[in-house]
Protein backbone atom coordinates (compact mmCIF):
# COMPACT_ATOMS: atom_id res chain seq x y z
CA UNK A 1 0.00 0.00 0.00
CA UNK A 2 2.86 2.39 0.72
CA UNK A 3 4.19 1.95 -2.78
CA UNK A 4 0.78 2.61 -4.21
CA UNK A 5 0.37 5.76 -2.19
CA UNK A 6 3.78 6.95 -3.26
CA UNK A 7 2.89 6.33 -6.86
CA UNK A 8 -0.28 8.32 -6.59
CA UNK A 9 1.39 11.15 -4.74
CA UNK A 10 4.32 11.49 -7.12
CA UNK A 11 2.41 13.51 -9.80
CA UNK A 12 1.18 15.94 -7.16
CA UNK A 13 4.75 16.68 -6.10
CA UNK A 14 5.67 17.23 -9.71
CA UNK A 15 2.72 19.59 -10.09
CA UNK A 16 3.81 21.60 -7.10
CA UNK A 17 7.33 21.84 -8.45
CA UNK A 18 6.13 22.84 -11.91
CA UNK A 19 3.81 25.48 -10.42
CA UNK A 20 6.67 26.99 -8.45
CA UNK A 21 8.61 27.40 -11.69
CA UNK A 22 5.89 29.35 -13.48
CA UNK A 23 7.06 32.85 -14.47
CA UNK A 24 4.23 35.31 -13.93
CA UNK A 25 5.00 39.09 -13.79
CA UNK A 26 4.84 40.43 -10.23
CA UNK A 27 3.59 43.87 -9.20
CA UNK A 28 6.35 46.28 -8.33
CA UNK A 29 5.49 46.26 -4.70
CA UNK A 30 6.04 42.52 -4.55
CA UNK A 31 9.30 42.45 -6.47
CA UNK A 32 12.39 41.95 -4.37
CA UNK A 33 14.77 44.80 -4.37
CA UNK A 34 17.39 44.53 -7.06
CA UNK A 35 15.40 41.97 -8.95
CA UNK A 36 16.29 41.80 -12.59
CA UNK A 37 13.74 42.84 -15.17
CA UNK A 38 13.22 41.54 -18.68
CA UNK A 39 13.03 43.78 -21.72
CA UNK A 40 9.60 45.21 -22.07
CA UNK A 41 8.88 45.18 -18.35
CA UNK A 42 7.99 48.58 -17.07
CA UNK A 43 6.16 50.11 -14.24
CA UNK A 44 3.61 51.62 -16.64
CA UNK A 45 2.82 48.36 -18.50
CA UNK A 46 -0.54 46.88 -17.73
CA UNK A 47 -0.22 44.29 -15.07
CA UNK A 48 -1.62 40.77 -15.81
CA UNK A 49 -3.81 39.91 -12.87
CA UNK A 50 -3.04 36.77 -10.94
CA UNK A 51 -5.52 33.88 -11.46
CA UNK A 52 -7.40 32.88 -8.46
CA UNK A 53 -6.37 29.43 -7.21
CA UNK A 54 -9.73 27.96 -8.27
CA UNK A 55 -10.30 30.12 -11.38
CA UNK A 56 -10.84 28.88 -14.93
CA UNK A 57 -7.27 29.67 -15.88
CA UNK A 58 -5.77 27.73 -13.02
CA UNK A 59 -3.63 24.67 -13.75
CA UNK A 60 -6.03 22.38 -11.94
CA UNK A 61 -8.91 23.51 -14.16
CA UNK A 62 -6.72 23.05 -17.24
CA UNK A 63 -5.88 19.45 -16.26
CA UNK A 64 -9.52 18.58 -15.61
CA UNK A 65 -10.50 20.05 -18.99
CA UNK A 66 -7.83 18.05 -20.82
CA UNK A 67 -8.90 14.82 -19.14
CA UNK A 68 -12.49 15.45 -20.16
CA UNK A 69 -11.52 16.21 -23.77
CA UNK A 70 -9.39 13.05 -24.03
CA UNK A 71 -12.17 10.90 -22.59
CA UNK A 72 -14.67 12.39 -25.03
CA UNK A 73 -12.40 11.85 -28.04
CA UNK A 74 -11.61 8.32 -26.87
CA UNK A 75 -15.30 7.46 -26.64
CA UNK A 76 -15.97 8.86 -30.10
CA UNK A 77 -13.05 6.91 -31.56
CA UNK A 78 -14.20 3.70 -29.87
CA UNK A 79 -17.70 4.19 -31.26
CA UNK A 80 -16.36 4.68 -34.79
CA UNK A 81 -14.21 1.54 -34.52
CA UNK A 82 -17.18 -0.46 -33.22
CA UNK A 83 -19.34 0.61 -36.15
CA UNK A 84 -16.54 -0.15 -38.63
CA UNK A 85 -15.84 -3.67 -37.42
CA UNK A 86 -19.51 -4.47 -36.90
CA UNK A 87 -20.18 -3.76 -40.56
CA UNK A 88 -17.04 -5.60 -41.73
CA UNK A 89 -16.03 -4.42 -45.13
CA UNK A 90 -19.45 -2.95 -46.04
CA UNK A 91 -19.23 -0.48 -48.83
CA UNK A 92 -19.98 3.13 -48.01
CA UNK A 93 -21.59 3.46 -51.40
CA UNK A 94 -25.40 3.54 -51.36
CA UNK A 95 -27.29 0.40 -52.26
CA UNK A 96 -27.73 -3.03 -50.71
CA UNK A 97 -24.92 -4.68 -52.62
CA UNK A 98 -21.99 -5.88 -50.55
CA UNK A 99 -18.49 -5.51 -51.84
CA UNK A 100 -17.02 -8.71 -53.12
CA UNK A 101 -14.44 -10.06 -50.69
CA UNK A 102 -10.97 -10.53 -52.04
CA UNK A 103 -9.97 -14.21 -52.21
CA UNK A 104 -7.92 -15.49 -49.31
CA UNK A 105 -4.42 -16.69 -50.18
CA UNK A 106 -4.11 -20.47 -50.33
CA UNK A 107 -2.00 -21.66 -47.37
CA UNK A 108 1.21 -23.59 -47.89
CA UNK A 109 1.03 -27.09 -46.44
CA UNK A 110 3.89 -28.50 -44.43
CA UNK A 111 5.48 -31.92 -44.98
CA UNK A 112 3.48 -35.08 -44.35
CA UNK A 113 4.60 -37.14 -41.38
CA UNK A 114 5.71 -40.70 -42.02
CA UNK A 115 6.61 -43.28 -39.39
CA UNK A 116 9.98 -44.97 -39.81
CA UNK A 117 9.89 -48.75 -40.08
CA UNK A 118 13.48 -49.33 -38.86
CA UNK A 119 13.30 -53.12 -39.42
CA UNK A 120 10.74 -55.92 -39.45
CA UNK A 121 9.80 -56.81 -35.87
CA UNK A 122 10.89 -53.46 -34.43
CA UNK A 123 8.63 -52.26 -31.59
CA UNK A 124 8.10 -48.79 -30.14
CA UNK A 125 5.91 -47.52 -27.32
CA UNK A 126 3.31 -44.83 -27.97
CA UNK A 127 0.39 -43.26 -26.13
CA UNK A 128 -2.73 -42.82 -28.22
CA UNK A 129 -4.97 -43.02 -25.14
CA UNK A 130 -4.12 -40.94 -22.07
CA UNK A 131 -2.49 -42.99 -19.34
CA UNK A 132 -2.16 -46.15 -21.43
CA UNK A 133 0.78 -47.46 -23.43
CA UNK A 134 0.44 -49.14 -26.81
CA UNK A 135 3.15 -50.91 -28.80
CA UNK A 136 3.59 -50.50 -32.55
CA UNK A 137 5.33 -53.36 -34.35
CA UNK A 138 6.77 -53.14 -37.86
CA UNK A 139 5.37 -55.92 -40.06
CA UNK A 140 7.08 -55.02 -43.34
CA UNK A 141 9.14 -52.28 -44.97
CA UNK A 142 7.68 -52.70 -48.47
CA UNK A 143 4.98 -51.55 -47.96
CA UNK A 144 5.64 -49.65 -44.75
CA UNK A 145 3.22 -51.66 -42.60
CA UNK A 146 2.60 -51.63 -38.84
CA UNK A 147 0.46 -53.44 -36.28
CA UNK A 148 -0.84 -52.03 -32.97
CA UNK A 149 -2.71 -54.53 -30.75
CA UNK A 150 -5.43 -53.28 -28.42
CA UNK A 151 -6.05 -50.07 -30.35
CA UNK A 152 -9.79 -50.56 -29.73
CA UNK A 153 -11.40 -52.17 -26.71
CA UNK A 154 -13.81 -55.09 -27.12
CA UNK A 155 -16.69 -52.80 -26.10
CA UNK A 156 -15.72 -50.23 -28.73
CA UNK A 157 -15.58 -52.94 -31.40
CA UNK A 158 -19.05 -54.17 -30.48
CA UNK A 159 -20.39 -50.61 -30.50
CA UNK A 160 -19.08 -49.95 -34.02
CA UNK A 161 -20.71 -53.15 -35.27
CA UNK A 162 -23.96 -52.16 -33.56
CA UNK A 163 -23.93 -48.66 -35.10
CA UNK A 164 -23.28 -50.14 -38.55
CA UNK A 165 -26.16 -52.59 -38.17
CA UNK A 166 -28.49 -49.80 -37.04
CA UNK A 167 -27.60 -47.71 -40.08
CA UNK A 168 -27.86 -50.65 -42.46
CA UNK A 169 -25.26 -52.19 -44.77
CA UNK A 170 -25.35 -52.44 -48.54
CA UNK A 171 -23.66 -54.86 -50.91
CA UNK A 172 -20.17 -53.76 -51.90
CA UNK A 173 -20.09 -53.54 -55.68
CA UNK A 174 -17.36 -52.66 -58.12
CA UNK A 175 -19.03 -51.86 -61.38
CA UNK A 176 -17.99 -49.54 -64.20
CA UNK A 177 -20.57 -46.78 -64.62
CA UNK A 178 -22.04 -45.47 -67.86
CA UNK A 179 -19.93 -42.34 -67.36
CA UNK A 180 -16.83 -44.55 -67.28
CA UNK A 181 -17.69 -46.20 -70.60
CA UNK A 182 -18.50 -42.83 -72.17
CA UNK A 183 -15.19 -41.41 -70.95
CA UNK A 184 -13.32 -44.39 -72.37
CA UNK A 185 -15.01 -43.85 -75.73
CA UNK A 186 -14.26 -40.13 -75.64
CA UNK A 187 -10.54 -40.82 -75.21
CA UNK A 188 -10.51 -42.34 -78.71
CA UNK A 189 -7.80 -44.89 -77.98
CA UNK A 190 -7.17 -46.97 -81.08
CA UNK A 191 -7.21 -50.74 -80.88
CA UNK A 192 -3.57 -50.75 -81.95
CA UNK A 193 -2.66 -48.55 -78.97
CA UNK A 194 -4.69 -50.77 -76.67
CA UNK A 195 -3.02 -53.89 -78.03
CA UNK A 196 0.43 -52.42 -77.46
CA UNK A 197 -0.56 -51.47 -73.92
CA UNK A 198 -1.66 -55.02 -73.13
CA UNK A 199 1.28 -56.68 -74.89
CA UNK A 200 3.70 -56.51 -71.97
CA UNK A 201 6.47 -58.62 -73.53
CA UNK A 202 6.08 -56.97 -76.97
CA UNK A 203 5.97 -60.25 -78.87
CA UNK A 204 2.94 -59.25 -80.94
CA UNK A 205 0.67 -61.77 -79.20
CA UNK A 206 -1.65 -61.41 -76.20
CA UNK A 207 -1.28 -64.29 -73.77
CA UNK A 208 -4.00 -64.90 -71.18
CA UNK A 209 -1.86 -63.67 -68.31
CA UNK A 210 -1.16 -60.40 -70.14
CA UNK A 211 -4.88 -59.79 -70.51
CA UNK A 212 -5.52 -60.81 -66.89
CA UNK A 213 -2.79 -58.49 -65.58
CA UNK A 214 -4.54 -55.44 -67.04
CA UNK A 215 -8.19 -56.52 -67.15
CA UNK A 216 -8.91 -57.32 -63.54
CA UNK A 217 -12.65 -56.87 -63.59
CA UNK A 218 -15.54 -56.83 -65.96
CA UNK A 219 -19.04 -56.37 -64.59
CA UNK A 220 -17.73 -56.78 -61.06
CA UNK A 221 -16.61 -60.27 -62.00
CA UNK A 222 -13.13 -61.51 -61.19
CA UNK A 223 -11.48 -62.47 -64.46
CA UNK A 224 -9.88 -65.91 -64.63
CA UNK A 225 -8.29 -67.81 -67.55
CA UNK A 226 -11.49 -69.86 -67.80
CA UNK A 227 -13.93 -66.96 -68.13
CA UNK A 228 -11.57 -65.04 -70.46
CA UNK A 229 -11.60 -68.00 -72.85
CA UNK A 230 -15.37 -68.27 -72.41
CA UNK A 231 -15.68 -64.62 -73.47
CA UNK A 232 -13.35 -65.11 -76.46
CA UNK A 233 -15.57 -67.93 -77.65
CA UNK A 234 -18.81 -65.96 -77.18
CA UNK A 235 -17.68 -62.90 -79.15
CA UNK A 236 -15.65 -64.99 -81.65
CA UNK A 237 -12.41 -63.17 -80.83
CA UNK A 238 -10.18 -66.28 -80.98
CA UNK A 239 -11.06 -68.30 -84.10
CA UNK A 240 -8.31 -70.90 -83.65
CA UNK A 241 -9.14 -71.35 -79.95
CA UNK A 242 -5.53 -71.31 -78.74
CA UNK A 243 -6.20 -68.69 -76.03
CA UNK A 244 -3.75 -66.26 -77.64
CA UNK A 245 -4.78 -63.20 -79.67
CA UNK A 246 -2.69 -61.97 -82.55
CA UNK A 247 -2.75 -58.32 -83.58
CA UNK A 248 -5.01 -59.22 -86.51
CA UNK A 249 -7.45 -61.12 -84.27
CA UNK A 250 -7.51 -58.30 -81.75
CA UNK A 251 -8.09 -55.69 -84.49
CA UNK A 252 -11.05 -57.67 -85.83
CA UNK A 253 -12.68 -57.74 -82.40
CA UNK A 254 -15.43 -55.18 -81.74
CA UNK A 255 -14.89 -53.79 -78.22
CA UNK A 256 -18.60 -53.01 -78.00
CA UNK A 257 -19.22 -56.75 -78.11
CA UNK A 258 -16.91 -57.10 -75.12
CA UNK A 259 -18.90 -54.57 -73.04
CA UNK A 260 -22.21 -56.08 -74.18
CA UNK A 261 -21.05 -59.54 -73.15
CA UNK A 262 -19.91 -58.37 -69.71
CA UNK A 263 -23.19 -56.56 -69.04
CA UNK A 264 -25.26 -59.58 -70.05
CA UNK A 265 -23.52 -62.03 -67.73
CA UNK A 266 -24.39 -61.70 -64.07
CA UNK A 267 -21.64 -62.93 -61.80
CA UNK A 268 -22.26 -65.18 -58.82
CA UNK A 269 -21.15 -63.92 -55.40
CA UNK A 270 -18.13 -66.22 -55.36
CA UNK A 271 -17.07 -64.83 -58.75
CA UNK A 272 -17.11 -61.18 -57.68
CA UNK A 273 -14.04 -59.03 -57.14
CA UNK A 274 -15.32 -58.52 -53.61
CA UNK A 275 -18.07 -60.28 -51.73
CA UNK A 276 -19.05 -58.16 -48.74
CA UNK A 277 -21.47 -55.57 -47.33
CA UNK A 278 -20.51 -52.16 -45.95
CA UNK A 279 -21.68 -48.80 -44.62
CA UNK A 280 -20.17 -45.46 -43.61
CA UNK A 281 -20.12 -43.92 -40.11
CA UNK A 282 -19.27 -40.26 -39.63
CA UNK A 283 -16.87 -39.19 -36.90
CA UNK A 284 -17.36 -35.42 -36.71
CA UNK A 285 -19.56 -33.21 -34.55
CA UNK A 286 -22.80 -34.94 -33.62
CA UNK A 287 -21.33 -38.43 -33.97
CA UNK A 288 -21.15 -40.89 -31.08
CA UNK A 289 -18.41 -39.91 -28.63
CA UNK A 290 -16.60 -43.21 -29.26
CA UNK A 291 -16.45 -42.43 -32.98
CA UNK A 292 -14.94 -39.01 -32.26
CA UNK A 293 -12.49 -40.55 -29.78
CA UNK A 294 -11.28 -43.05 -32.41
CA UNK A 295 -10.60 -40.20 -34.80
CA UNK A 296 -8.50 -38.46 -32.13
CA UNK A 297 -6.51 -41.65 -31.62
CA UNK A 298 -5.86 -41.89 -35.35
CA UNK A 299 -4.76 -38.26 -35.28
CA UNK A 300 -2.23 -38.98 -32.51
CA UNK A 301 -1.11 -42.21 -34.15
CA UNK A 302 -0.45 -40.73 -37.60
CA UNK A 303 0.79 -37.33 -36.32
CA UNK A 304 -0.76 -35.71 -39.37
CA UNK A 305 -2.36 -32.28 -39.26
CA UNK A 306 -5.94 -32.18 -37.87
CA UNK A 307 -7.23 -30.70 -41.12
CA UNK A 308 -6.04 -33.68 -43.16
CA UNK A 309 -7.50 -36.27 -40.78
CA UNK A 310 -10.78 -34.46 -40.08
CA UNK A 311 -11.52 -33.82 -43.76
CA UNK A 312 -10.82 -37.41 -44.78
CA UNK A 313 -13.38 -40.12 -45.48
CA UNK A 314 -15.78 -41.32 -42.81
CA UNK A 315 -15.20 -44.70 -41.18
CA UNK A 316 -16.11 -47.57 -43.50
CA UNK A 317 -17.45 -50.66 -41.70
CA UNK A 318 -17.39 -53.93 -43.67
CA UNK A 319 -18.95 -57.33 -43.01
CA UNK A 320 -17.72 -60.47 -44.76
CA UNK A 321 -20.02 -63.43 -44.33
CA UNK A 322 -18.94 -67.02 -44.77
CA UNK A 323 -17.56 -67.21 -48.31
CA UNK A 324 -16.72 -63.49 -48.29
CA UNK A 325 -13.47 -62.23 -49.79
CA UNK A 326 -11.80 -59.27 -51.49
CA UNK A 327 -9.26 -60.00 -54.21
CA UNK A 328 -5.92 -58.20 -53.98
CA UNK A 329 -5.99 -54.51 -54.88
CA UNK A 330 -4.42 -51.20 -53.91
CA UNK A 331 -6.39 -48.55 -52.01
CA UNK A 332 -5.19 -45.63 -54.14
CA UNK A 333 -5.06 -45.11 -57.86
CA UNK A 334 -2.29 -43.27 -59.71
CA UNK A 335 -3.11 -39.72 -60.76
CA UNK A 336 -2.55 -39.14 -64.46
CA UNK A 337 -3.37 -35.97 -66.43
CA UNK A 338 -6.73 -37.59 -67.25
CA UNK A 339 -7.63 -38.30 -63.60
CA UNK A 340 -8.40 -36.32 -60.48
CA UNK A 341 -8.79 -37.25 -56.83
CA UNK A 342 -12.36 -37.96 -55.71
CA UNK A 343 -12.10 -35.81 -52.61
CA UNK A 344 -10.68 -32.67 -54.27
CA UNK A 345 -12.65 -32.70 -57.52
CA UNK A 346 -15.28 -30.33 -56.07
CA UNK A 347 -12.74 -27.53 -55.62
CA UNK A 348 -10.26 -28.31 -58.39
CA UNK A 349 -12.30 -26.57 -61.09
CA UNK A 350 -10.78 -28.90 -63.67
CA UNK A 351 -12.55 -30.93 -66.33
CA UNK A 352 -11.09 -34.44 -66.51
CA UNK A 353 -12.81 -37.69 -67.53
CA UNK A 354 -11.76 -39.92 -64.63
CA UNK A 355 -11.54 -39.75 -60.87
CA UNK A 356 -9.72 -41.97 -58.41
CA UNK A 357 -9.37 -42.44 -54.67
CA UNK A 358 -6.29 -40.72 -53.24
CA UNK A 359 -5.61 -42.38 -49.90
CA UNK A 360 -2.28 -41.55 -48.34
CA UNK A 361 -2.77 -44.02 -45.50
CA UNK A 362 -5.01 -46.94 -44.60
CA UNK A 363 -5.83 -47.64 -40.95
CA UNK A 364 -7.68 -50.97 -40.69
CA UNK A 365 -9.37 -52.17 -37.48
CA UNK A 366 -10.33 -55.78 -36.77
CA UNK A 367 -13.68 -55.71 -34.96
CA UNK A 368 -13.98 -59.42 -34.13
CA UNK A 369 -12.08 -62.69 -34.00
CA UNK A 370 -12.76 -64.75 -37.11
CA UNK A 371 -13.40 -68.46 -36.67
CA UNK A 372 -11.85 -69.48 -39.98
CA UNK A 373 -9.91 -67.62 -42.68
CA UNK A 374 -10.36 -63.89 -43.25
CA UNK A 375 -6.68 -62.93 -43.03
CA UNK A 376 -5.42 -59.75 -44.68
CA UNK A 377 -2.83 -60.83 -47.23
CA UNK A 378 0.00 -58.77 -48.72
CA UNK A 379 1.11 -60.99 -51.64
CA UNK A 380 4.38 -59.20 -52.49
CA UNK A 381 5.35 -57.67 -49.13
CA UNK A 382 9.12 -57.19 -48.87
CA UNK A 383 9.79 -58.73 -52.28
CA UNK A 384 13.16 -57.66 -53.65
CA UNK A 385 11.49 -56.45 -56.86
CA UNK A 386 7.98 -55.91 -58.15
CA UNK A 387 6.76 -57.02 -61.57
CA UNK A 388 3.07 -57.07 -62.32
CA UNK A 389 3.46 -59.96 -64.73
CA UNK A 390 5.12 -62.06 -62.03
CA UNK A 391 1.88 -62.00 -60.04
CA UNK A 392 0.51 -64.58 -62.46
CA UNK A 393 2.68 -67.66 -62.91
CA UNK A 394 1.30 -70.80 -64.55
CA UNK A 395 -1.98 -71.52 -62.75
CA UNK A 396 -1.26 -69.33 -59.73
CA UNK A 397 -2.60 -65.78 -59.53
CA UNK A 398 -1.31 -64.23 -56.32
CA UNK A 399 -4.10 -61.67 -56.43
CA UNK A 400 -6.75 -64.40 -56.17
CA UNK A 401 -7.57 -64.47 -52.46
CA UNK A 402 -10.07 -67.30 -52.78
CA UNK A 403 -7.61 -69.79 -54.22
CA UNK A 404 -4.08 -68.67 -53.46
CA UNK A 405 -4.13 -66.65 -50.24
CA UNK A 406 -1.73 -69.11 -48.64
CA UNK A 407 0.92 -68.25 -51.22
CA UNK A 408 1.13 -64.56 -50.28
CA UNK A 409 4.28 -63.29 -48.57
CA UNK A 410 2.52 -61.88 -45.48
CA UNK A 411 -0.82 -62.68 -43.85
CA UNK A 412 -2.26 -60.85 -40.83
CA UNK A 413 -4.75 -62.83 -38.76
CA UNK A 414 -7.77 -60.84 -37.53
CA UNK A 415 -7.67 -60.20 -33.80
CA UNK A 416 -10.38 -58.12 -32.16
CA UNK A 417 -9.23 -54.59 -31.31
CA UNK A 418 -5.98 -54.78 -33.31
CA UNK A 419 -5.24 -52.09 -35.90
CA UNK A 420 -2.89 -52.36 -38.86
CA UNK A 421 -1.89 -49.33 -40.89
CA UNK A 422 0.24 -48.68 -43.94
CA UNK A 423 1.20 -46.02 -46.48
CA UNK A 424 -0.21 -46.35 -49.99
CA UNK A 425 2.23 -43.89 -51.57
CA UNK A 426 5.97 -43.58 -51.65
CA UNK A 427 7.43 -40.22 -50.53
CA UNK A 428 8.33 -37.74 -53.25
CA UNK A 429 11.52 -36.55 -51.50
CA UNK A 430 9.95 -33.19 -50.67
CA UNK A 431 7.69 -34.21 -47.82
CA UNK A 432 4.67 -34.98 -49.95
CA UNK A 433 2.99 -37.77 -51.92
CA UNK A 434 4.95 -39.57 -54.62
CA UNK A 435 4.13 -42.65 -56.70
CA UNK A 436 1.70 -45.34 -55.59
CA UNK A 437 3.53 -48.07 -53.64
CA UNK A 438 2.92 -51.23 -55.67
CA UNK A 439 3.93 -53.32 -52.66
CA UNK A 440 0.79 -52.10 -50.84
CA UNK A 441 -1.17 -54.66 -52.88
CA UNK A 442 -3.42 -56.45 -50.37
CA UNK A 443 -6.67 -58.39 -50.13
CA UNK A 444 -9.10 -60.14 -47.82
CA UNK A 445 -8.70 -63.91 -47.72
CA UNK A 446 -11.73 -66.18 -48.02
CA UNK A 447 -13.77 -66.43 -44.81
CA UNK A 448 -14.18 -70.18 -44.39
CA UNK A 449 -16.14 -70.13 -41.12
CA UNK A 450 -18.09 -67.46 -39.28
CA UNK A 451 -18.23 -63.74 -40.01
CA UNK A 452 -15.52 -61.13 -40.33
CA UNK A 453 -16.03 -57.47 -39.32
CA UNK A 454 -13.48 -54.75 -40.09
CA UNK A 455 -13.42 -50.95 -40.32
CA UNK A 456 -11.27 -48.69 -42.48
CA UNK A 457 -10.09 -45.16 -41.77
CA UNK A 458 -8.61 -43.79 -44.99
CA UNK A 459 -6.54 -40.61 -44.83
CA UNK A 460 -7.03 -38.64 -48.04
CA UNK A 461 -4.23 -36.54 -49.54
CA UNK A 462 -4.09 -35.20 -53.09
CA UNK A 463 -0.70 -35.70 -54.80
CA UNK A 464 -1.09 -32.07 -55.86
CA UNK A 465 -0.10 -30.00 -52.84
CA UNK A 466 -1.90 -26.93 -54.21
CA UNK A 467 -5.18 -28.82 -54.73
CA UNK A 468 -5.00 -30.32 -51.24
CA UNK A 469 -4.42 -26.86 -49.73
CA UNK A 470 -7.33 -25.41 -51.69
CA UNK A 471 -9.55 -28.29 -50.57
CA UNK A 472 -8.70 -27.82 -46.90
CA UNK A 473 -9.25 -24.08 -47.14
CA UNK A 474 -12.67 -24.55 -48.74
CA UNK A 475 -13.75 -27.20 -46.23
CA UNK A 476 -12.70 -24.96 -43.35
CA UNK A 477 -14.71 -22.09 -44.83
CA UNK A 478 -17.80 -24.27 -45.20
CA UNK A 479 -17.42 -25.44 -41.61
CA UNK A 480 -17.19 -21.84 -40.34
CA UNK A 481 -20.25 -20.80 -42.31
CA UNK A 482 -22.24 -23.82 -41.19
CA UNK A 483 -22.44 -25.16 -44.71
CA UNK A 484 -21.81 -28.75 -43.65
CA UNK A 485 -22.25 -30.98 -40.64
CA UNK A 486 -18.58 -30.85 -39.62
CA UNK A 487 -17.62 -32.92 -42.66
CA UNK A 488 -17.94 -32.55 -46.43
CA UNK A 489 -20.52 -34.67 -48.21
CA UNK A 490 -18.63 -37.65 -49.54
CA UNK A 491 -19.69 -39.65 -52.58
CA UNK A 492 -17.16 -42.39 -51.93
CA UNK A 493 -19.05 -45.49 -52.94
CA UNK A 494 -19.57 -44.66 -56.58
CA UNK A 495 -18.97 -47.60 -58.83
CA UNK A 496 -16.18 -46.09 -60.86
CA UNK A 497 -14.32 -44.80 -57.79
CA UNK A 498 -14.15 -48.34 -56.48
CA UNK A 499 -13.40 -49.73 -59.91
CA UNK A 500 -10.56 -47.27 -60.42
CA UNK A 501 -8.96 -48.46 -57.19
CA UNK A 502 -8.66 -51.87 -58.79
CA UNK A 503 -6.96 -50.73 -62.00
From Swiss-Prot:
Residues 83-503 are lumenal. Disulfide bonds: none annotated. Glycosylated. Residues 1-61 are cytoplasmic. Its EC number is 1.14.11.29. Residues 310-461 form the Fe2OG dioxygenase domain. It is an enzyme of class 1 (oxidoreductase). InterPro entries: EF-hand-dom_pair (IPR011992), EF_Hand_1_Ca_BS (IPR018247), EF_hand_dom (IPR002048), Oxoglu/Fe-dep_dioxygenase_dom (IPR005123), P4HA-like (IPR045054), Pro_4_hyd_alph (IPR006620), Pro_4_hyd_alph_FE2OG_OXY (IPR044862). Pfam families: 2OG-FeII_Oxy_3 (PF13640), EF-hand_7 (PF13499). Keywords: Calcium, Dioxygenase, Endoplasmic reticulum, Glycoprotein, Iron, Membrane, Metal-binding, Oxidoreductase, Repeat, Signal-anchor, Transmembrane, Transmembrane helix, Vitamin C, Zinc, Zinc-finger. 2-oxoglutarate binds at residue 452. Catalyzes the post-translational formation of 4-hydroxyproline in hypoxia-inducible factor (HIF) alpha proteins. Hydroxylates HIF1A at 'Pro-402' and 'Pro-564'. May function as a cellular oxygen sensor and, under normoxic conditions, may target HIF through the hydroxylation for proteasomal degradation via the von Hippel-Lindau ubiquitination complex. PANTHER family: PROLYL 4-HYDROXYLASE ALPHA SUBUNIT, TRANSMEMBRANE PROLYL 4-HYDROXYLASE. This is Transmembrane prolyl 4-hydroxylase.
